[in-house]
């Protein structure tokens, strides 16, 4: 097997992912944020259930992913941007001159890591939140729950890949996080309540994520949601991710490290 075969490059990038401490730290942070906040929401709702408007056990479990995603954005940005800040990207390109192959291996290793971490985070958060809800809980086999959990895993995985693409475009972890964290944490969630901006902001990645997780509702129920369904949400999220990754590849191919 050639040292620059796809399998060898993927193995090398996988090793890089897990030899930096930031990978474990960011995944742990995502776990703590998602599970901790999801469980707290569930406990609070259970203790005051008669005053909860539009009670939905899925929202109690999965809304915390809107905070947990921020750690996965940081993970994606660091996996790429740290090589630029340290200068090790030059060494990587010397070892693997085929930039598309290197980029593909890096993105795939990061995406697989995000997928594995997201699966654990989503399942544990759901189970913990449902345990906290007690008699108001729902089960894994309830209609709509498996697709919502799968949607949450897909969303968290793709948002990490999206972050990797943006970090490659801007060639900096800090700049990528400076763009994405405010956008996902404050942007469409806050600005989405402005009627004039809704037609545009409803197509941003985080809004598609709400739809995928089945925790977005129509404006009539008090929660801002895009309302275009899971299929369209997945297409929108894939389009954003593909655009970011393709842009990242074009920048990597066309500019010196």
Region annotations inferred by a language model:
Residues 1-11:
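Short, membrane-interfacial amphipathic segments enriched in basic
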Residues 13, 96-98, 166, 172, ...:
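Generic structural signal for small/hydrophobic residues in well-ordered secondary structure
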Residues 27, 90, 103, 177-178:
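Hydrophobic/aromatic positions within or immediately flanking transmembrane alpha-helices
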Residues 2-4, 22-77, 103-169, 185-196, ...:
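Secretory targeting signals
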Residues 73-95, 99-100:
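Transmembrane helix boundary and interhelical loop/hinge segments in multi-pass membrane proteins
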Residues 235-257:
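Junction motif at the cytosolic side of a transmembrane helix
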Residues 21-24, 100, 174-175:
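Residues that define the loop-to-transmembrane-helix transition and helix capping
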Residues 97-108, 179:
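Amphipathic cytosolic juxtamembrane alpha-helices at the membrane-cytosol interface
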């Amino acid at each position: 097997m050639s040292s620059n075969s796809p399998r060898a490059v993927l193995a090398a990038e996988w090793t890089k992912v897990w030899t930096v401490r930031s990978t474990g730290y960011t995944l742990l942070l995502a776990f703590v944020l998602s599970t901790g906040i999801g469980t707290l929401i569930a406990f609070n709702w259970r203790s005051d259930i008669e005053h909860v408007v539009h009670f939905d056990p899925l929202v109690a479990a999965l809304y915390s992913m809107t905070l947990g995603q921020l750690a996965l954005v940081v993970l994606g940005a660091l996996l790429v941007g740290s090589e630029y800040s340290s200068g090790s990207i030059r060494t990587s390109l010397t070892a693997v001159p085929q930039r598309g192959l290197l980029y593909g291996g890096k993105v795939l290793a990061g995406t697989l890591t995000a997928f594995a971490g997201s699966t654990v985070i989503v399942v544990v958060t759901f189970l913990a939140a449902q345990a906290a809800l007690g008699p108001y809980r729902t089960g894994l086999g309830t209609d709509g729950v498996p697709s919502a959990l799968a949607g949450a895993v897909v969303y968290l995985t793709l948002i990490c890949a999206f972050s990797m693409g943006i970090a490659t475009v801007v060639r900096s972890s800090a700049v990528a996080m400076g763009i994405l964290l405010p956008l996902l944490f404050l942007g469409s969630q806050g600005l989405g309540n402005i009627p004039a901006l809704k037609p545009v902001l409803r197509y941003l990645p985080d809004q598609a994520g709400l739809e995928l997780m089945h925790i977005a509702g129509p404006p009539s129920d008090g929660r801002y949601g895009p309302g275009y369904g899971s299929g369209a949400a997945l297409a929108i999220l894939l389009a954003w991710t593909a655009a970011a990754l393709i842009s990242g590849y074009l920048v990597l191919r066309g500019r010196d490290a």
